[in-house]
A protein has these predicted regions:
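Long, low-complexity or tandemly repetitive, helically biased scaffold regions used
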Residues: 1, 43-350
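Low-complexity, intrinsically disordered, cysteine-poor segments enriched in small/polar
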Residues: 4-8, 12-15, 19-26, 30-33, ...
Length: 350
């Protein structure tokens, strides 16, 4: 009877705690939507748009048509998709087009995250039930994990494409240029060969998979370190017209609205919960693996456990891609607002 009461009490506490966490996450979501980073960014953009509308009929000052950009000048430099060549954004139309491209990239990676919830949950279930106690269990557990992660890996490989950048290759992974960003940044997906091929059930094969999964990553790097040293210290940027400033603000606002809409959705909370569960399961699995005594583990079971943990960590890194892109959009939007304000200062005041 006492044991039954204790079990009921634990279940009641667990349910209450889950409800508290859910309510807290909804509160954080509300804060993020109305007074968070992107809500404040949207207010700055709307202020820029409002001020641009007041400039109708204003004339540019004599000799002020060209702005000298010395601070944050690299944000006007962009590498080619498959080479180290650099192009400069020097007009308002070019800047507007760049923001539109960034919105498309954000939409792509957000959709990648949006569609991963079931796959992440499936992978978490397989990881939670993994048993690396003996050879047979370890083989089955790794096979289950391999199957569970196949969908995530396929999306990552499909997004990687074929634009290889061998200069950025590492010992265990090839670099694929998936996007270029202003600021002379390049988005690289690091993928080993045969990452989705099921390995043989040997400790050597598991060690190789451990190295491969550790190499899986998404990096935002300088397009070319040597060329970056030669980027112009001062870039001549054509002062934007009031209509271009207004259009820039409108394009920036669309991107922010896309982000706010997603981050305030139920799907975002579900995805976040799935990733959080994966992280907790990963930590428990790794602790269980580390604490397994040498007497209970063979070379294979230990190697398979390490490979499984590396697989889970690689999955976590892949799932962080949208966050990195959204963070970049925030910083670049602030730079664009600065360019808009600098252009306004080139006009005569009434």
């Amino acid at each position: 009877c006492a044991e039954s009461m204790w079990t009921s009490a634990k279940a009641l506490f667990s349910n209450a705690w889950d409800a508290i966490v859910k309510a807290y996450r909804k509160f954080c979501q509300w804060v993020d939507k109305y007074i968070g980073t992107f809500a404040r960014l949207k207010m700055k953009i709307e202020s820029l748009e409002k001020d641009a509308k007041k400039m109708d009929g204003m004339k540019i000052k004599s000799g002020e048509k060209k702005l000298e950009i010395t601070s944050g000048n690299k944000n006007l430099a962009k590498p080619a998709i498959t080479s180290a060549e650099v192009t400069y954004i020097t007009t308002g139309r070019g800047l507007i087009a760049e923001v539109a491209d960034l919105r498309k990239e954000n939409a792509t990676v957000i959709e990648m995250q949006r569609s991963q919830e079931d796959a992440v949950t499936k992978f978490s279930d397989a990881l939670s039930g993994a048993n690396f106690g003996d050879h047979a269990d370890a083989v089955k557990s790794y096979d289950d994990l391999h199957t569970a992660t196949s969908g995530i890996l396929k999306k990552f490989k499909d997004k990687a494409g074929t634009n290889q950048m061998s200069a950025h290759d590492t010992t265990h992974a090839k670099a694929y240029s998936v996007a270029v960003l202003p600021g002379y940044q390049r988005v690289l997906f690091m993928l080993p060969e045969s990452i989705d091929t099921k390995p043989q059930a040997t400790d050597g094969a598991m060690d190789a998979m451990y190295d491969k999964f550790n190499a899986v990553d998404m990096k935002v790097v300088d397009g070319d370190p040597e060329l970056k040293k030669t980027i112009k210290e001062t870039i001549q940027f054509e002062a934007m017209s009031p209509s271009d400033i207004e259009e820039l603000a409108n394009e920036l606002k669309k991107g922010v609205d896309d982000i706010i809409q997603y981050r305030s959705s139920k799907q975002y909370l579900k995805n976040e919960a799935a990733v959080r569960r994966l992280k907790e399961t990963l930590e428990k699995t790794d602790t269980r693996r580390v604490n397994t005594s040498d007497d209970d583990a063979s070379k294979y079971t230990r190697a398979a456990g390490k490979a499984a943990v590396a697989m889970a960590r690689a999955t976590m890194r892949m799932l962080s891609v949208p966050t990195k892109m959204v963070t970049f959009y925030d910083s670049y939007a602030n730079f664009c607002i600065g360019i808009g304000r600098k252009s306004m200062s080139a006009y005569e005041t009434r």
